[in-house]
Amino acid sequence: MEEVRDCRLEEGLSVEGLVECYRDIHGFMAGHLAEAVEVLREGLEASSVRVLTFTGNLVATGLRGVLAQLIDGGLFNVVFTTAGALDHDIARFMGGKYLKGRFEADDTELHRRGVHRLGNVFIPVESYGPLVERFVRTLAEQAAGVRGEWGVYELLRLAGSLMEGDRDSILAAAARRGVDVFVPGWPDGAFGTSLFMERQRGTSITVDYFRDMARLADIFFPQEGEAAALIVGGGISKHHAIWWSQFRGGLDYAVYVTTAVEYDGSLSGAHPREAVSWGKIKESSRRVVVYGDATITLPVIAYCLLHGCG
């Protein structure tokens, strides 16, 4: 066993130096974060299937640009996320103003003023729903002009092409890099509701998620090579990633970044070792959990993946 070493913070300390400091500190999540960087660097280099999952709330923060950069950097070739991520990515592309607020704000007063609150981010009503609706109308009309039936991932590829020019857009980055974005809960937000309303208005478009599942089968059923995943947060995007991974024998590398705990039996809090029992992560895998707010931990991890640490 290595000894715990004391860390000294010298002037001009780099991110690489900070991660080395975390490795020396070791207790308690510092060592986990340093190990996560090691696992991901090894896994992303070795794997043919490289998965990134994240929850929609993060896209309402400035972490949106970091997530887009991870995709644009070619580190991942499969993305799983939630309907909220689509809404926030589109709304911000359309000029929506997301404001720095406070957790302890008066929500009744915010409602009366037409402001949504997402944690300590304030979203004026006009910066959200109406912008997504306007974008989806254009998207649906363009899609219907090509063909009648679409998978969700195919629509999102088209959406990303319409968002080209926004370097911080997740969908635009995915479209540029040819990365498929899968959103199993796609109806559960403004994007899905707006598509439904366009269908009700008479736009000739049908969404068939079985097309997405066929594409996922193409990705995950082949047994060649290895698979790695960076899973940020929990919920449906986390589960869809590990669910499909079981069909190739499980993930070879897995890093979870979460604030959820396993003691309530929730999917979001479930530890990688629990996924081993389901065959979703391999017994022989390299795996680590980093407990902490992703808006703090992920930028450090992402920097090391993009620019190198250690």
Swiss-Prot record:
Biological role: Catalyzes the NAD-dependent oxidative cleavage of spermidine and the subsequent transfer of the butylamine moiety of spermidine to the epsilon-amino group of a specific lysine residue of the eIF-5A precursor protein to form the intermediate deoxyhypusine residue.
The encoding gene: dys
Organism: Aeropyrum pernix (strain ATCC 700893 / DSM 11879 / JCM 9820 / NBRC 100138 / K1)
GO cellular component: a single term: cytoplasm
Residues in the signal sequence: none
The reaction(s) this protein catalyses: [eIF5A protein]-L-lysine + spermidine = [eIF5A protein]-deoxyhypusine + propane-1,3-diamine
The protein's name in its UniProt record: Probable deoxyhypusine synthase
Pathway(s) per entry: Protein modification; eIF5A hypusination
Molecular-function GO terms, alphabetical: deoxyhypusine synthase activity
Documented EC number(s): 2.5.1.46
Keyword Transferase listed: yes
Co-factor(s): NAD(+)
Stated family: Belongs to the deoxyhypusine synthase family.
InterPro entries from the UniProt entry: Deoxyhypus_synthase_arc, Deoxyhypusine_synthase, Deoxyhypusine_synthase_sf, DHS-like_NAD/FAD-binding_dom
SUPFAM superfamilies documented for this protein: DHS-like NAD/FAD-binding domain
Catalytic residues in the record: 280 (nucleophile)
HAMAP family reported for this sequence: DHS (MF_00153)
Catalytic class of the enzyme: transferase
The organism's taxonomic lineage, starting at the top: Archaea, Thermoproteota, Thermoprotei, Desulfurococcales, Desulfurococcaceae
